[in-house]
């Protein structure tokens, strides 16, 4: 095939492409390599541990899909599962909203504020 179609999954915070970046910075379609772009709009504050958890979850989801055809549907399912995983990291406090982001829209829910039970009203 001269011009293979690029398969991709795009959610608010996760982009997965069936392809790889070449030396010129172009995305080249591939049936063998997946490229993951996490939080492309920098909506969250990340630390290395949280990023590694996402990469491990991605690897786990891809491994669970091994043997299945590489289709838009299967790629979207992995992307959707990763999006839910990011929500769980946010709810656990392992990542937080980036209040300096270009747009603050709280797409995964309004931040929760801890209330100190010892405070007197």
Curated annotation (Swiss-Prot):
InterPro entries: NdhM. Its EC number is 7.1.1.-. It is a peripheral membrane protein. It is an enzyme of class 7 (translocase). It catalyses: a plastoquinone + NADH + (n+1) H(+)(in) = a plastoquinol + NAD(+) + n H(+)(out); a plastoquinone + NADPH + (n+1) H(+)(in) = a plastoquinol + NADP(+) + n H(+)(out). GO terms for cellular component: plasma membrane-derived thylakoid membrane. One of its GO terms (molecular function) is oxidoreductase activity, acting on NAD(P)H, quinone or similar compound as acceptor. It is found in: Cellular thylakoid membrane. Keywords: Membrane, NAD, NADP, Plastoquinone, Quinone, Thylakoid, Translocase, Transport. Its main location: membrane. It comes from the Bacteria. Belongs to the complex I NdhM subunit family. NDH-1 can be composed of about 15 different subunits; different subcomplexes with different compositions have been identified which probably have different functions. NDH-1 shuttles electrons from an unknown electron donor, via FMN and iron-sulfur (Fe-S) centers, to quinones in the respiratory and/or the photosynthetic chain. The immediate electron acceptor for the enzyme in this species is believed to be plastoquinone. Couples the redox reaction to proton translocation, and thus conserves the redox energy in a proton gradient. Cyanobacterial NDH-1 also plays a role in inorganic carbon-concentration. This is NAD(P)H-quinone oxidoreductase subunit M. It comes from Nostoc punctiforme (strain ATCC 29133 / PCC 73102). The gene is ndhM.
């Amino acid at each position: 095939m001269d011009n293979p179609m690029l398969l991709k999954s795009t959610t608010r915070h996760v982009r997965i492409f069936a392809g790889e970046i070449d030396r010129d910075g172009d995305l080249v379609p591939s049936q063998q390599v997946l490229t993951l772009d996490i939080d492309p709009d920098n909506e969250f504050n990340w630390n290395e541990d949280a990023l590694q958890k996402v990469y491990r979850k991605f690897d786990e989801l891809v491994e669970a899909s091994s043997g299945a055809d590489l289709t838009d549907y299967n790629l979207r399912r992995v992307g959707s599962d990763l999006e839910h995983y990011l929500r769980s990291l946010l709810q656990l406090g392992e990542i937080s909203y980036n209040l300096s982001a270009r747009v603050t829209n709280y797409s995964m829910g309004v931040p929760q504020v801890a209330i100190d039970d010892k405070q007197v009203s």
